[in-house]
Amino acid sequence: MGYVDWCIEQHRKTNHYYDKYLPYGFHLRMANNVYEDFQHLLDEELNDYCGKAVWGHDLIEDTRVSYNDVKNQLDEGAADIIYAVTNDKGKNRKERAGDKYYEGIRNTPGAVFVKLCDRIANVQYGKMSKSRMFEMYKKENSDFEQYLGRYTSNKDLEPMFVYLKNLFNE
């Protein structure tokens, strides 16, 4: 079984759905489509890690696999990215994605890219389905950009930040 199938299978085994009724592979494919659109922004090594991490970005958070499981199935670089984008424990969204969480993303090569792939896919789907999540993402986008270091450490990903912001303005 290849890594893409393995990632999808882990979500299937835990009955994990996207928007309550879609197989989770739907979201992973959307995130991968974003990766394919922007992979030219990455160097070759990071491109390989991010390509794998996009498929596995929710594994540790949403399925019954550990960092070591991910490392053994994908590789250490992808596992480090997936670990970085995994929400912290918390009682609400703000606690799960606090300063420490975003610091870990900023400090892990490739993690900002993968987080942007995930967020863009979620916003695209939210816009298409008229989900209430779309408005939440729109409201928090300015802070999200700051947390990810748009104007400081991640200027090379500017086309992704612009694309995301434009989704809210179309």
Which role fits each region the language model picked out?
Residues 1-170:
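Active-site helical microenvironments for divalent-metal-assisted chemistry
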